[in-house]
């Protein structure tokens, strides 16, 4: 676990990441991972998932276990715990406040969750629309 966590680019400030994601000049696709204990265990079982985590542009400590391990093993006392939900809500608010129409693409595991997500975003964010919803098989 120590070696794995040490190799990650753990993010301590979500505001900076959101600024980078919203930068109109930066057209490159960005990959964010919200790592918790469950997803860490999955990396041990799934080599493709582990490679995806290791190649991510941004890795957030989205679980108390990862957060504490980072602080204990690597003295990352500055590291904030940033949950996927909090980050996502902040990102959607920033996207919507740009007053420009933005398109979203979601990948998820269950159709029912994607439908609920789509409805909530349509109801609450007037500048955001969907290009696609995709299930993972």
Locate predicted features.
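Conserved beta-alpha
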Residues: 67, 72-137
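N-terminal nucleotide/polyanion-binding subdomain common to many enzyme families
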Residues: 1-85
